[in-house]
A protein has these predicted regions:
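Flexible "arm" and connector segments at domain edges
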Residues: 1-162
Length: 162
């Protein structure tokens, strides 16, 4: 996965939106908004996959003309975009870029049967990254997010990049 190119694409998209909408805000406001957007996208990812809906027999929402797998991939990539944007806004790109070397190792991780604890840990670390300005917590949250996509959801690097 070309994480450098994905970061550049995320930053470009964000700048395009800001220019088109004529948004003028402080860096703090921009960062705060990106964290909220990521939180919402992660919730949408969970809601789309429906792993936590133990009462349902058939899990996984789908958009018209898409499979549940394609719909979930779309939500996953939306969330990834905000991780990448935050890494740039907070000058934490090195955490994302360092993870490039560990992708093969992450792909060897054990698939979780119940994603609840992993999801809550990912969100807890994300909130710690925001409230305590912790790059290490961001790094851990990012790596759990990669595991979700590459292991627990079973996407390939190519699927995620495309």
């Amino acid at each position: 996965m070309d994480l450098q190119a994905l970061i550049a694409s995320s930053v470009y998209l964000n700048r395009e939106i800001e220019a088109k909408k004529q948004l003028h805000w402080s860096n703090d406001g921009r960062v705060k908004n990106a964290f909220v957007a990521l939180d919402v996208e992660l919730a949408e990812m969970a809601n789309t996959s429906e792993w936590f809906k133990v009462w349902k027999v058939h899990r996984g929402k789908q958009d018209p003309d898409k499979t549940p797998r394609q719909t979930l991939l779309y939500e996953y990539v939306d969330a990834m975009d905000f991780y990448l944007l935050i890494s740039n806004l907070k000058n934490w790109n090195h955490f994302v870029l360092k993870s490039q070397d560990d992708i093969e190792k992450i792909k060897q991780s054990k698939e979780e049967n119940n994603l609840d604890k992993q999801y809550l840990a990912m969100k807890r670390m994300l909130f710690d990254a925001y409230f305590n300005h912790s790059g290490d917590s961001f790094n851990h949250s990012w790596r759990l997010f990669l595991k979700f996509g590459l292991v627990d959801f079973g996407y390939t690097e190519d699927e995620i990049e495309t």
